[in-house]
């Protein structure tokens, strides 16, 4: 209930997540009146009740694009969320990120939103000199090298070390590899 959530104020540093993406996805039945789209208001209400220091929000690219009829919000939901979080006292930045550029084996661009309570931005001016997303781009190469990652890896590349370190077992599916994950099973 709301009282329990309010009691968490000052104790929560980060809320990470976002509402279901199905109603916004360009890959599915993108429908503005999908009832799951209204969960964005529950998310905003949750943020307002808990008041975390930081917000990390993720959704599909379609979240940044308006619907044809635009009868509900009149614009892209991403702009609505940014406006609402700014009203609640957050400095907010949103950006589309292709995670394959950062070594993730999937070719899906996602909308990422980062919010920081205004009081923390005001007390730490270095937070406003360079945005979160500028730092990601600037440090991308160093990150990839430090994690031994490549841009646009295949799934096989990404998990191949699992097979090498723990061994393979014969797969029942033709052309598939099966591995032993975690500790090797003892005989």
Predicted features and spans:
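S-adenosyl-L-methionine-dependent DNA methyltransferase catalytic core
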Residues: 110-187
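A short, glycine/Asx- and small/polar-enriched loop/turn
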Residues: 8, 105-110
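Core alpha/beta nucleotide-donor-binding catalytic domains of modification enzymes
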Residues: 1-54, 60-79, 86
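Secondary-structure boundary elements
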Residues: 49, 53, 84-91, 116-127
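Short catalytic/ligand-binding loop motif for oxyanion handling, primarily in non-cytosolic enzymes
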Residues: 22-26, 63-66, 103-107, 120-124
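A short acidic, often aromatic-flanked loop/helix-cap motif at beta-alpha or helix-coil junctions
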Residues: 2-4, 100-104
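An acidic- and aromatic-residue-enriched active-site/binding cleft used to recognize and process polar
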Residues: 60, 97, 118
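Conserved S-adenosyl-L-methionine
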Residues: 90-101
């Amino acid at each position: 209930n709301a009282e329990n959530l309010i009691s968490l104020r000052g104790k929560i540093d980060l809320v990470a997540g976002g509402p279901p993406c199905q109603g916004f996805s360009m890959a599915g039945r993108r429908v503005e009146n999908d009832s799951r789209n209204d969960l964005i208001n529950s998310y905003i209400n949750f943020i307002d009740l808990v008041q975390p220091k930081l917000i990390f929000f993720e959704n599909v690219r379609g979240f940044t694009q308006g619907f044809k009829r635009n009868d509900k919000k009149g614009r892209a939901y991403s702009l609505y969320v940014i406006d609402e979080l700014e009203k609640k006292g957050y400095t907010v930045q949103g950006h589309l990120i292709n995670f394959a550029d950062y070594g993730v084996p999937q070719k899906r661009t996602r909308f990422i939103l980062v919010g920081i309570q205004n009081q923390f931005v005001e007390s730490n001016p270095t937070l406003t000199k360079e945005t979160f997303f500028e730092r990601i781009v600037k440090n991308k190469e160093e990150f990839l090298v430090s994690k031994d990652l490549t841009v646009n890896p295949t799934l096989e590349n990404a998990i191949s070390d699992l097979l090498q370190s723990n061994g393979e077992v014969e797969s029942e599916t033709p052309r598939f590899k099966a591995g032993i994950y975690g500790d090797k099973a003892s005989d």
